[in-house]
């Protein structure tokens, strides 16, 4: 059927574009593939000489959750906050880039030695990226705006700016300004998450770890504790990565005008492993709260 449709379109001066399942067929070289089931279909297509639009659902779908599901309107499932989208490599032309993408697609560390990537001859076949929105759980225009903005700005920038020239903290500063501008224009943009993300990189043979705290808000007053207590306005103010002993419990929260915003985040620094943010939530929307936005 796919080959019949492709032949019909070609006879009428048209080019077929289809989801990556079409790679199972004997396609003409003129067909274009949309890679939505991760990145592997796009990598295969580009290396086989087909034009590709990169649109991995695990990263570039706007109908996925963008913050703690219990604080958000019901969505399709999954988790794609703005930083996750911003870190995507549209042209995974090295093992390291492909592994970075695969790690956030799978929600776990993936070694560069275990992934396919786009070879030199295939890079020019990646013609763009696409963010997708499916509306099973989106009932109003305002809800649609809430799901798309400001994540659409991250997708736009990753499309025209190489990954090595993108810097999260610079983008974070700018995106907070743009959220205010969107609201001023009557667009119901998501105001960005108040959650604090804690990551830990093990040092000294597992005896210590470098801890990083991050939030989407800017400027941000993030306070933390290392003694098991909840952060309060007088707790240590985060001003950059710090080192702790393995076995330490880090608790952190965002504060605005002396009050905690959002919820407290907690991480036990395990001596056996790094703790990275791979943006994982269960893909079961029925367990999540459904609230109006």
Regions found by a protein language model. Name each.
Residues 166-293:
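Short, compositionally stereotyped local motifs that mark structural "simplifiers"
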Residues 17-21, 34-36, 53-55, 132, ...:
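Generic beta-strand/beta-sheet core signal
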Residues 20-30, 61-65, 86-92, 128-135:
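Active-site clefts of carbohydrate-active enzymes
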Residues 72-207, 216-220:
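Substrate-binding clefts and catalytic carboxylate motifs of secreted carbohydrate-active enzymes
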Residues 27, 63-71, 141-145:
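Histidine/acidic-residue-rich catalytic or RNA/ligand-binding cores of hydrolases
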Residues 9, 33, 152, 224, ...:
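Hydrophobic, well-ordered secondary-structure elements that form the walls
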Residues 1-50:
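Active-site neighborhood of glycoside hydrolase catalytic domains
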Residues 10-20, 52-56, 162-168, 190-191, ...:
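Acidic/polar loop patches that form or flank catalytic/metal-binding clefts of enzymes
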């Amino acid at each position: 059927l796919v080959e019949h449709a492709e032949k019909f379109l070609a006879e009428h001066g048209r080019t077929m574009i289809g989801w990556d399942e079409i790679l199972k067929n004997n396609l003409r070289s003129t067909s274009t593939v949309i890679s939505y089931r991760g990145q592997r279909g796009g990598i295969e297509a580009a290396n086989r000489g087909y034009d590709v639009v990169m649109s991995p659902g695990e990263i570039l779908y706007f109908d996925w959750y963008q913050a703690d599901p219990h604080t958000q309107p019901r969505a399709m499932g999954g988790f794609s906050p703005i930083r996750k989208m911003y870190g995507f490599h549209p042209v995974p032309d090295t093992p390291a880039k492909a592994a970075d993408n695969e790690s956030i697609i799978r929600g776990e560390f993936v070694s560069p030695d275990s992934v396919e990537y786009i070879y030199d001859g295939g890079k020019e076949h990646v013609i763009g990226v696409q963010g997708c929105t499916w509306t099973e759980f989106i009932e109003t225009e305002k809800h649609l705006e809430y799901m798309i903005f400001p994540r659409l700005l991250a997708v736009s920038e990753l499309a025209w700016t190489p990954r090595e020239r993108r810097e999260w903290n610079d983008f974070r500063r700018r995106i907070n300004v743009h959220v205010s501008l969107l609201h001023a224009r009557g667009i119901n943009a998501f105001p960005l998450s108040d959650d604090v993300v804690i990551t830990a990189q093990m040092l000294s043979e597992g005896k210590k770890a470098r801890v990083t705290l991050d939030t989407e808000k800017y400027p941000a007053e993030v306070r933390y504790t290392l003694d098991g207590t909840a952060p309060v306005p007088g707790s240590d103010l985060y001003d950059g990565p710090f080192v702790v002993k393995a076995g330490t419990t880090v608790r952190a929260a965002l504060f605005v005008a002396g009050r905690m915003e959002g919820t407290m985040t907690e991480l036990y620094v395990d001596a056996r492993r790094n703790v990275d943010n791979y943006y994982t939530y269960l893909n079961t929307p029925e367990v999540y709260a459904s609230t109006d936005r």
